[in-house]
Amino acid sequence: MAKKPVRVTVTGAAGQIGYALLFRVASGQMLGPDQPIILQMLELPIDKVQAALKGVMMELEDCAFPLLADMIGTGDPKVAFKDSDYALLVGARPRGPGMERKDLLLENAKIFIEQGKAMNAVASRDIRVIVVGNPANTNAWIAMKSAPDLPKGNFTAMLRLDHNRAKSQLATRTGKPVASVEKMIVWGNHSPTMYPDIRFCTVDGQPAVKLVNDEAWYRNEYIPKVGKRGAAIIEARGLSSAASAANAAIDHMHDWALGTNGKWVTMGLPSDGSYGIPEGTMYGVPVTCTPGKYERVKGLEIDAFSREKMDFTLKELTEEQAGVKEMVK
């Protein structure tokens, strides 16, 4: 029997990441080849932006995707999130020239408070949310705080781009296919402070630490390279990573919806207090997924170097939260 369509909200739908994302979602790459979807696309209520969104919708029509049951484009969050089952919050205020990080946090807080409240009012009670727009962890925390009637654990931040980057760099170093890299972890914030941890990682079944066998490379080259990859792409391309970010968002939601078959992936989650991370802090941790559910990988040993790196990224997250606390009471 044909499945009932699910509603997928995408914010920032006419932007670079939105454009790289929507066609793959509509083709079934996110929720599977037999799951019809209704796309609910949100963009700024500005004529020029809404016109661009209309153009994207025309292209979606022209693809004649069998799984795309319906779609709407709107400037109203209450319309975009109505009965939504999945939300990909891509739209965020980018950092402008001379803009302090603090100002960026406050500008984005307004957006994610409004969207959190809209979801709280009209979305499915089991909506699953990923925040892609930066600062992703703190934006996800703000949205979660602004939607008190929805399950806190259904709000997540995208660490999958860092996770995929970390896997790819390790595969390159070891000369093995990226598919052979397993049990990668990226702890903390989606920012250059995050900590890609390869201590439990295997490549072709071999311990990654033994294969690499170079602590100095790992600490001084690999970790900073993964952390600064986004900046390197901006320098090379003149634009921020869009297709790889869209790909990571699809990976994240695909695995959450359909499961990982026991494989570890990284998700930014509200902490349950494990690994010494204060409860509620939106923090990247390793998980495995079964359809519709994630489960944290527990009981991993944290050595002194890891503790230092994990606390460093936590400090940044705590400062970000403190910067917007007044707004999300």
Curated annotation (Swiss-Prot):
Temperature section of the record: Optimum temperature is 60 degrees Celsius with oxaloacetate as substrate.
Catalytic residue list: 190 (proton acceptor)
UniProt keyword terms in alphabetical order: NAD, Oxidoreductase, Tricarboxylic acid cycle
UniProt keyword annotation of NAD present: yes
Regulation: Substrate inhibition is observed at high concentrations of oxaloacetate.
Record: residues binding substrate: 95, 101, 134, 165
EC number: 1.1.1.37
Record field: catalytic activity: (S)-malate + NAD(+) = oxaloacetate + NADH + H(+)
Uppermost EC category: oxidoreductase
pH dependence: Optimum pH is 8.5 with oxaloacetate as substrate.
GO molecular function: L-malate dehydrogenase (NAD+) activity
Classification via Gene3D superfamilies: Lactate dehydrogenase/glycoside hydrolase, family 4, C-terminal, NAD(P)-binding Rossmann-like Domain
Keyword hit for Acyltransferase: no
Highest taxon in the source lineage: Bacteria
Pfam family for this entry, one: Ldh_1_N
GO terms of biological process kind: malate metabolic process; tricarboxylic acid cycle
Record-listed NAD(+) binding positions: 12-18, 108, 115, 132-134
Function summary: Catalyzes the reversible oxidation of malate to oxaloacetate. Catalyzes the reduction of oxaloacetate more efficiently than the oxidation of malate.
Family per record: Belongs to the LDH/MDH superfamily. MDH type 2 family.
Subunit details: Homodimer.
Stated name of the protein: Malate dehydrogenase
Organism annotation: Syntrophobacter fumaroxidans (strain DSM 10017 / MPOB)
Gene name as annotated: mdh
